[in-house]
Amino acid sequence: ATPKQAAFALALHGGAGAMPKGTYTPEQEAAFHAKLAEAAKVGYEMLQRGDSAVDVVQAVIAILEDSPLFNAGRGSVFTNNGKIKMDAAIMNGRTLDAGSISNVQRIKNPIKAARMVMDSSKYIMFSSAGAERFAEKYNLEMVDVSYFYTQHQYERWKGMKDSTEGGYIHYVDSVMALQKEPVALKNIEEKY
């Protein structure tokens, strides 16, 4: 018998790039894998229930943002000048609707703000203080910038800042969920 093909797929990763062997202890690597497994399980269960791919992406990214282990939300990398500023973007591949925020410092879950931009505004992007005012208007949770600080990221920033390399590499976290449904292709110019 031919195995039944799943009606959906879920892909996630906790950062791009290859970390040199020995960067993390086996316990730290286990913590990364456990959190990714938790996020994948939540996303898989949502897709099995029939939740939309966009809802799944938002929920899974929020799990990563809430964890100090990943470079999204809590645990974000520091900018070259020692600040924490975050971006997030989300898109519905079926409708081509998109929303994003950039350069924010107090929105607990930037992905929720990006989703709110997509669903509740005529714009595609808000940035900085404007993005934070938008998030407050829609009662998204705001936190003090210290919430995002982790000693690990501070030490990484300090090491890069003090090095002669002169740059700071930012690894991105991302999630993608696909639903196997017919998609009506639209002329992109009709959308924008």
Predicted regions located by residue number:
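Alpha/propeptide regions of enzymes that mature by internal proteolysis
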Residues: 2-192
